[in-house]
Amino acid sequence: MRLYDTHCHFERADPTEIAAVLARAKAAGVEKLMAVGGSPALNEAAALAAEVAAEALVAPKVCCAVGFDREQINKHGDTETQRHDVDNALCLRASGLKNSLAAWGEIGLDYHYSPETRTAQLELFGRQLEEARRRDLPVAIHTREADEDTLGLLREIPSRGVIHCYTGTPGMARRFLDLGFFISISGIVTFRAADNVRASALVVPDDRILIETDSPFLAPVPHRGRANEPALIRHTCEFLAELRGVSADAFAEQTFANAERILG
């Protein structure tokens, strides 16, 4: 079984810790993973994960994504000068990644905690969609309680990529699929109350579904409540395979091939 974790985070830029996580992932059948940024610290840790994997004897192949998520507005401000500084810092980080940079992210909109920052979030999201398009990179998109605005901006700035950790309705999933996006399902699908996620997972075509951990968050059952990591993606794979009526090996291979098409 070959597994591809299309979205995970490393919260600390600790080479020893990262190497241990990667070794456990490799032992669990993870052949590739994408380490995802979203803040200066996460971007650095994602870049380090790619470096550690390249030098390790036992590790999956690691690509990475860098970006600034919506939370950075509160941390870094939204004046013209601050926006310029953020964009420059991000582009400098991306330029140093060379062959390991596979996507721009995570980026997107989240109105759950800070709906008052909607305008600033849209502006930041739009700038990064433009940068990803300039670099010919797919995007890793977070959307929470903001799907209509997310769709609107993706229509305005045509992009390709992944709607990560999808938790929306089946109908909304179809609308993202109509724009050409892949839908990535996390361990949330194994949670007892996640009927909506399971329903959505069933409408995604075989050639557009991906799996992810979003680690260190959202550990799947039977590990819910502990820190998540890429090695645990096997549980999500097996759960979704049973849900969709296919073998775990076949589903792992399908999602691996899908991920390679969009992320490499």
Mark where each language-model region is.
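Mid-domain alpha/beta scaffold segments of enzyme catalytic cores
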Residues: 1-264
